[in-house]
């Protein structure tokens, strides 16, 4: 996962005009990277995070369709907040990515150092996809990620 992130960081020249092909390319690269990171963290630390425990509790309290809409909404709102509003408040790329990924991680209530590292990593990749494509790219990645986690763990 570190190699994947470093490669993405090396590719950090921002695209000015983003087409659907580029968006899908970066969404795919980001998704595979997130999958590798999550699998590695799962092998190291099998216990779920506080965020996962909260989501499991919520999932059992509401109909599945409502929970699915919640995940979709969370993906869109989080990306708009972190990688549009906050993103545009800061000019320097390194600070943009660091600020948004740290705040993203904090919002997901990491209860352990490993959970913290996982959410920071997720935030880093969402930030790099945002930079290499656009807000729709990071929203798409976040949405695909949340839906994949839902299908794999909650159904």
Kindly give the residue locations of the regions a language model identified:
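Juxtamembrane helix-loop-helix connectors linking adjacent transmembrane helices
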Residues: 12-74
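Alpha-helical transmembrane segments in multi-pass membrane proteins
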Residues: 1-11
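Transmembrane helix-loop-helix hairpins at the membrane interface
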Residues: 64-155
């Amino acid at each position: 996962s570190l190699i994947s992130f470093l490669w993405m960081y090396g590719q950090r020249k921002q695209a000015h005009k983003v087409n659907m092909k580029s968006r899908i390319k970066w969404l795919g690269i980001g998704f595979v990277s997130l999958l590798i990171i999550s699998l590695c963290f799962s092998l190291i630390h099998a216990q779920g995070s506080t965020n996962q425990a909260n989501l499991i509790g919520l999932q059992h309290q509401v109909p599945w369709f409502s929970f699915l809409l919640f995940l979709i909404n969370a993906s869109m709102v989080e990306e708009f907040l972190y990688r549009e509003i906050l993103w545009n408040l800061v000019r320097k790329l390194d600070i943009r990515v660091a600020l948004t990924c740290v705040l993203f991680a904090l919002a997901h209530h990491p209860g352990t150092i490993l959970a913290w590292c996982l959410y920071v990593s997720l935030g880093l990749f969402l930030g790099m996809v945002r930079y290499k494509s656009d807000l729709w790219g990071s929203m798409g990645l976040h949405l695909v990620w949340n839906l994949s986690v839902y299908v794999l763990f909650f159904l």
